[in-house]
Amino acid sequence: MLKEVKIELTNKCSRNCKHCSSNATSRIGNLKILDFEDVSRIIKEAKLMGADTIVFTGGEPLMYDRLPELVELTSKLGMKSTIYTFAYRTDETLNKYRQLIDLGLNKIVYSLADSLSDEEDISVDDKVEFFDKVFENNNLRLGFHYTVSKDSFSRLESGVTETIETFKSRSYFDRVSLLRFVPHGKGTTDMDLSKEELLAIKNLYLNSNDKDKIRLGTPWNILGIENTPCIIADEIMIIGFDGIAYPCDSIKYFTKLGISGNIRENSLMEMYNSEYFSNIRKFNTDNSCSTCEQYPICKSGCIGQKIIANYTESEDKVLTLKRCINSRDPKCMR
């Protein structure tokens, strides 16, 4: 059952992060943006399908001029709204966040990708003083995203620990979510993590005194710590800035095994019930790893990672999809 729809409103962003899964850009000639009327319709259809959360992302969602109207619409429909953002911490950004809060925004998730951005940080405030001002006199929640790649691995422990120590006394702070790097978008295979680095991440989590402030999620099931059920093509949908609905963030803009449809031509329900989404749900069951003692926790790993790692061109896309899902995670810890 659908619970959350993420909408990449635009690919416009000033940060130019080297790991960006959406190939976000500031180049005028390459900018893409979703039509406001199409997005509004998708939000209304999400409500009819029982979804309770809309996530606005990008690119940088603050660069979408009519974002305030979309947040207000989401709130009036009785759904929660979240933005994934990495805007520079300036007075202009502060005012935009405060406007969205006044219109019903529920949560801000801010990126900790400072070390992965190629652009000069023109932020005026540090994170603490900035977010103290953002969350003054409201009940909004703040989360952070830290994408763990080979390029950001060296700063992982200090970055996560310092963030938690700094913000855990703030009532508005939720958690730091560790995002497993996927070699797609701008990200390249040489940025992928080794098994040794994955084990170090496991030890970091297990040795932390603030586990309740760290979110791992399904892609980290391979570490054998806990199982978080995979919700690909089921509880979640991602609308790309190209209008296509994708089953998961891990395989955004990957269309070699099927396309669900496009919001310019299809309803949300049609895309959710498309052959592509339906096959993913059907194949996401017990597979060749089911006899492994780690299977109850690992569940053979991340479907998106498996598809990207194991895809080979074939005329039979359904069979190829099944083979990829039935394979082991490329970073299987066995």
Regions found by a protein language model. Give the residues of each.
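Glycine-centered loop/turn positions within well-structured domains
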Residues: 15, 246, 300
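Flexible loop residues that form catalytic
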Residues: 25, 59, 113, 181, ...
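Conserved phosphate-coordination/catalytic loops
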Residues: 33-37, 121-125, 283
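Flexible mid-to-C-terminal extensions adjoining Fe-S/redox cofactors in radical SAM and related proteins
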Residues: 1, 23, 252-334
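Radical SAM enzyme [4Fe-4S]-AdoMet core and its adjacent flexible, acidic
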Residues: 29, 80, 99-246, 250-260, ...
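Conserved alpha-helical substructure of the radical SAM core
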Residues: 1-107
